[in-house]
Each structure stands twice: as C-alpha cells, then as structure tokens.
Amino acid sequence: MGAEVQHFENELASFLGVQVGQVVCVNSGTAAVMLATQAAVSLGDEVLVQSLTFVGTYQAIHAAGAVPVSCEVLPETATIDLVDAARRITPRTRAIMPVHYASNPGDLDAIYRFAAQHGLRVIEDAAHAFGCTYRGQMIGSFGDVQCFSFDGIKNITSGEGGAVVSADPVMLGRVKDARLLGIERDTERRFAGQRSWEFDVKRPGHRCHMSNVLAAIGRVQLQRFAGEFAPQRVALAWRYRELLAPLPGLALFATDLGPIVPHLQPVRVLGGRRDALRTHLQAAGVETGIHWKPNHLLTLFGGGKTPLPVTEQVYGELLSLPLHPGLQHGDVERVCSAVQDFFQHN
C-alpha cells in the first residue's frame, strides 16, 4: 500500500463527487462489505439482506461477526422487499444491506426512510453499481456507506479490489485501521512517509489493504470508464431490451437504463423453461450464468429451513446473458437470435 493507492482513492473521490479521504480502497468487494459491517455493527447484531445475492455478501457479514437475516426480493427488480424485511426485524437488528442487483439500486428513498424509522444503519452492497446514479446523484456520493467491487468482471477492475465510501469519519477511521490489521492510523502514517514501529491495536483487523499494483490498474480503468466502458455496456443492454422485450416467454427486470451502467444482463425465463433455454444456448455456443443461488438455501445460512417463496421462484427463472464491453452489437444479436429460435420451437 502506497502512493498508487492514495492516488486511486483520491481519483475515485473526484469521480464520485465526494471529499478526499472518504474513499478507502481494499483488496476485494467482499472485504469492503466485511470491513464496513464490522465498523457499523457489533458482534451478534443482525443485518437485513436479500437472499438473492452473491454468497460473498453473506460471508462478509458473517466474517464481521454479524448475522445475515434473509429477506425476500421484489420480483420486478430483484431488490430487497421492505415489507418482508419489516417482518424480520428483532431487537438485535442494527442494519439493512440493500444489494444493487444487476446495477439497480432499487428504491433508495424508501430504504433510507425504512432505516430511519427503525434506527438502522444502511450498508449498500454496490458491487454491481459503480458509475450508476440515483435521482441524478452518483451512487457513493450520498447516504450512509457504500461498498464497491473492482474484481475482474465488474464495471471497472483493478484485477481484484474494492472500496468503502462514507462521509462518516468514525466509520472511515475504523475501516482504515481494520484493513491493515487494526493498527491505529497506520494508513495516514504510510501515506505521509512516516511509518512508525510503535503502534497500538484496539479493534480486530485484517490484511485487506490494496496493493500499489492493483491500484495502478484501477487508475487506468477509471480513466476509460466514462468514455468507453459505460457507454458500451449501456448500448448493449439497450439492444438486448429491443430484441428480447417482445418475447412472451421472457420477463425483463424493471430497470431504467438511463441512470445505471449495467453489470449483468439477467432475464426471467417463464413457464419452467429456464434450464431448457440454457441448454439450447450452450449448444449454440452461448455461455450463460445464474446470478445467484439464494443464500438461505445454503447450509451455512439455513439450508432452506425458512422458505422464501418469491425469491425461490425468481431464482428458478433467472438466466444471465453475456454482457461485457468487449462485445459488439452483432454478438448481442447472435445471442438474441438463439433465444428467439428457442421460443419459436418450444
């Protein structure tokens, strides 16, 4: 950790429109969620979070010593259902973690009202949402705390990495210390070239700092984002929407492509035909994914003992089509042609 990390943090702050010092880079998005959770809540506290998210979200909460409480999603957006979340509040609930699924932040106004009503911290898992806006404001420029991911397939990559963004100085101080084994103020000393061998540790910490090499990659990626990566992702998502919206066997998520830069291109395949379509596309040379298996079905997080019927239905319909800035419109059209062919014959 050194000058490149400091430069990357400062450039991210400028991009997001926040003050220098409000961005803390770490070595993964999972680490960002873990450190933010550890800084925001205490051991044994509960965090409301949708089950339909990458297991890294749950493992990060678990590693922070908190308890993830699985909630339903809204089928139209695959974002957290606040009505269901309200039913799961207990005296131990201390935070809500909205997941910006496929770059869609959902109704953040409602989420922050909900949090204020119940006295909760809001830790946004914005791993998919770098570069997205909400009501004209950049995700990361407002609210409580946001966690970004810069792994190899995200909107920008540093090879591997993540960041915590917050205007809360107590939160930031805890995250900065915890990313480097809990050593108090070590980040500031290192950046100032005044590293001291005399230090104290008062809170648990981890080895989660970002290296200079990863930060240097991230800086170049950030320079390419607005003019290259973002417009290409948006254009490809629009083309998918134009070609797939008319198909009666598919449901597209209710996403406004104006303010978001889509990380994924998920669709819902209706009528129990998801797996058949996936097999058809594989035979046509089209790789697909399923984002994600709900966490409440995983052994560590309940093994399905508490059913979430809406989430389970959405999961059974989910299929992610190829989306990355290296694709061209012709690639999207070939994928959609294979999808159309399936529905014409099934």
Regions found by a protein language model. Name each.
Residues 3-11, 17-21, 83, 95-99, ...:
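PLP-dependent aminotransferase class I/II
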Residues 141-185:
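Active-site PLP attachment segment
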Residues 39-126, 133:
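PLP-dependent aminotransferase-like
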Residues 24, 48, 69, 122-123, ...:
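Structural detector of well-ordered beta-strand residues that form the stable sheet scaffold
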Residues 124-158, 197-202:
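Conserved active-site segment immediately N-terminal to the catalytic lysine
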Residues 47, 96, 146, 162-164, ...:
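Well-ordered beta-strand positions enriched in small/hydrophobic/aromatic, beta-favoring residues
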Residues 1-46, 60-63, 70-72, 137:
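Phosphate-binding glycine-rich loop
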Residues 52, 66, 73, 127-128, ...:
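Histidine-centered beta-alpha loop that forms part of the nucleotide-sugar donor binding/catalytic region
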